Amino acid sequence: MSKAIENKQVQVQEITEKFQNASSVVVVDYRGLNVAQVTELRKQLREAGVEFKVYKNTLTRRAAEAAGLEGINDVLVGPNAIAFSNEDVVAPAKIINEFAKKNEALEIKAGIIEGTISSVEDVKALAELPSREGLLSMLLSVLQAPVRNFALATKAVADQKEEQGA
């Protein structure tokens, strides 16, 4: 087997593993972005622990088929870059969506969330969700509300009794 074929097989295996291990994947068309813009996007994604790579479409298609994600092959046309996140499901969608708002040349094509192929609308909806910390703080405030209201009601009753007794 030639060295080139072996390298391609290794790349397909690498991409397949990334598809299988990633909690979320976002496929984008980066046509029209200059080098400085792509570098800025890579920097933002790297800071969030997201890997952003450009692979050949044929290798990506083979990897998607091996990972059982054949449905993503429809969008693998033209220059594509793929963002893989192993930890935070929301991070790649949020960063890329914000970047796409500022740079209209960046186009979100599709996503894979928890092993399920998602449309552009799904990826954008995911991007609009608050972060994990934000969701936890919302949950905490909802859980604290009854206790806080009870404490305020108790204090109001105590103040009222004090006024009547004075």
From Swiss-Prot:
Keywords, sorted A to Z: Ribonucleoprotein, Ribosomal protein, RNA-binding, rRNA-binding
Superkingdom, natural source: Bacteria
InterPro entries per UniProt: Ribosomal_uL10, Ribosomal_uL10-like_sf, Ribosomal_uL10_bac, Ribosomal_uL10_bac_type, Ribosomal_uL10_CS_bac
An example Gene Ontology CC term for this record: large ribosomal subunit
Cross-referenced PROSITE patterns: RIBOSOMAL_L10 (PS01109)
Listed Pfam families: Ribosomal_L10
Entry similarity comment: Belongs to the universal ribosomal protein uL10 family.
Protein name: Large ribosomal subunit protein uL10
Gene behind the chain: rplJ
